[in-house]
Regions:
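A short coil-to-beta-strand element that immediately follows conserved catalytic motifs
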Residues: 81-90
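Short beta-strand His + acidic residue motifs that chelate non-heme Fe in jelly-roll/DSBH
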Residues: 101-104, 171-178
C-alpha cells in the first residue's frame, strides 16, 4: 500500500564550521545580561535585536556567521519552494541550571533557528517539539513512537549544532539539569518581499 505524507514538519540540523568563531557571542550574552537582566523561566533572554539586523560585530566573525546562517535558511526555503528569506531578528539566551522555556511558536517567522553556543552536557535541556493537533487524545499511550503517530520529539543538541524549523512548530526547552549554563542564539527569518 502506498503512504502519502501530508503536512510533514521537518527539522533541519547543521553543524557550524569550526572556522566560525562563537566565543564573542557567548561574551556578548554575558555582557548584555549584566546590563539588562531580563528573566524568562529562571533563564535570561536579550531583547529582540530588531534594530541590529546584522551579526557583523566583530568583523569578520559576525559576517561569517550571518553568511552561513543566510545560506542555510535560503537553501531550506528553496527546497520548500518558498521565496528567499532574510533575518528578521535574533536574541541571545542563557539558561542556567533550573531554567527552561515554555511551549511557544514564533509568529511572523517563516523559519526559526537556534545555534547552540555552549552546551555543558545532554542534561542541559533538550528542545522538545510538540504536535499542534489532537493526536494525544487518539494515539494509545503505549504505542511505539514513529513520525506519523508521535506527538512529542526531543532533540538534545550539542555545541555548535544549528536546528532550524518552521515558525509555526510548537516547541519548548526542557529544564537545564546540568550544573553549568547553556548559551544559545535564536533567530527568525521571514520572506523577502
Amino acid at each position: 500500500m502506498q503512504q502519502i505524507d501530508i503536512f510533514t514538519t521537518p527539522i533541519w540540523k547543521a553543524l557550524l564550521p569550526q572556522s566560525v568563531d562563537t566565543q564573542w557571542l557567548i561574551d556578548l550574552a554575558y555582557e548584555k545580561k549584566g546590563t539588562n537582566p531580563l528573566n524568562n523561566c529562571n533563564g535570561w533572554q536579550s531583547f529582540d535585536q530588531e534594530q541590529e539586523m546584522s551579526f557583523a560585530f566583530p568583523i569578520p566573525q559576525g559576517l561569517k556567521l550571518q553568511q552561513f546562517l543566510d545560506d542555510c535558511m535560503n537553501s531550506i526555503a528553496k527546497e520548500l519552494g518558498l521565496p528567499m528569506v532574510s533575518l528578521l531578528n535574533y536574541w541571545l539566551n542563557i539558561n542556567p541550571p533550573g531554567a527552561y522555556n515554555n511551549l511557544h511558536k514564533h509568529r511572523n517567522a517563516l523559519l526559526v533557528g537556534n545555534l547552540y553556543l555552549q552546551v555543558p552536557d545532554k542534561n542541559s535541556g533538550g528542545i522538545e517539539f510538540v504536535r499542534d493537533d489532537d493526536a494525544d487524545y487518539y494515539v494509545p499511550v503505549d504505542a511505539n513512537y514513529n513520525p506519523v503517530i508521535g506527538t512529542r520529539h526531543i532533540i538534545n543538541p550539542e555545541q555548535r549544532d544549528i536546528l532550524i524549523f518552521p515558525g509555526w512548530q510548537p516547541h519548548a526547552v526542557q529544564t537545564n539539569k546540568s550544573d553549568k549554563d547553556r548559551v544559545s542564539l535564536s533567530f527568525n527569518y521571514g520572506a523577502i518581499k
